[in-house]
Amino acid sequence: MLSNIIPLSIGAALGATARWLLNLAVPAAMSPATGNLFANWTGALLIGIFAETINHPQWKLLLITGFLGSLTTLSGFSLETVTLLQSNRPASALANIFLHTAGSLLLTWLGLKIGAAVK
């Protein structure tokens, strides 16, 4: 059990830190939602690559469940979308939904293709 908790915890700490740093790196002129969008897109691409290339269970726990689970954020995406709707910005909310969903699906597919190519 502990042999699973350690890589999971390390990955989660690194993923949460990466998401926080990514949000700090987004210029103030851009939407606050942009940092989470980049995090979700990065995670979508990486999960495709990792799913194709990582076979060891401990590395899957560290990188996929821990790191990518903490890097990507459905709760942040949900809050951003609802906040846009509450701010009477339905077009921005729809754009946010489309960009997160379509972009993440496309990048996961691309990641799977990249992972299969380098395997």
From Swiss-Prot:
Na(+) binds at residues 69, 72. InterPro entries: FluC. It holds the Pfam family CRCB. It catalyses: fluoride(in) = fluoride(out). Keywords: Cell inner membrane, Cell membrane, Ion channel, Ion transport, Membrane, Metal-binding, Sodium, Transmembrane, Transmembrane helix, Transport. GO terms for molecular function: fluoride channel activity; metal ion binding. Fluoride-specific ion channel. Important for reducing fluoride concentration in the cell, thus reducing its toxicity. It is a multi-pass membrane protein. GO terms for biological process: cellular detoxification of fluoride. One of its GO terms (cellular component) is plasma membrane. Belongs to the fluoride channel Fluc/FEX (TC 1.A.43) family. Na(+) is not transported, but it plays an essential structural role and its presence is essential for fluoride channel function. The chain crosses the membrane at residues 5-25, 34-54, 59-79, 97-117. It is found in: Cell inner membrane. This is Fluoride-specific ion channel FluC.
